[in-house]
Amino acid sequence: MKLNEIKTSKDVYRFIDDNIAYGWIDINNQQHLNTMKEFRRIYRTMSVEEILKYKLGTCIEQVNLMHYLLNKINVKNKMYCCRIFEPDDYGNLEEEEHMHCFILYYENGKVYHMEHPNLDRKGIYEYNSESEAIKAIVDYYIELRGGKESPTKEFFEVPVGISFKEFNKYINHV
């Protein structure tokens, strides 16, 4: 599927599934596919244009691309970040990151969760309400994180070119 062929929310998912891999570009413009090694040290967020150019993204970029594409076809949507809280000055660059961004969209009186970056849960999930969707998603990540609380916040944009630490700080203050 090509970008100009996207007409429906299912087309958005199909486009991302056909064209976007899980990965990221570092500060040296090197690609990292299916690995988070050195992520806290050298990751930077990408623009929508860069995501489309490199055909990859973490949950942050993939959700931002879904948001962009859903907006283009006038489908209401919201971006969220679910994570174990880290203060603004958190400095352990060796620790695994415990964050997942996701998107909900709204059609026909229902709420849908479009999941692509989490390879174990790829797909579109239907819910009766926003609160039901958020609870199901957050509960999944709390269980995955061994019961650790995972505060979830809506966010409205992805600043381009910032580090993981800076993105975390941005989410802290949204």
Q: How should each PLM-predicted stretch be described?
A:
Residues 54, 58-61:
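Mid-length scaffold segments of soluble, non-membrane domains
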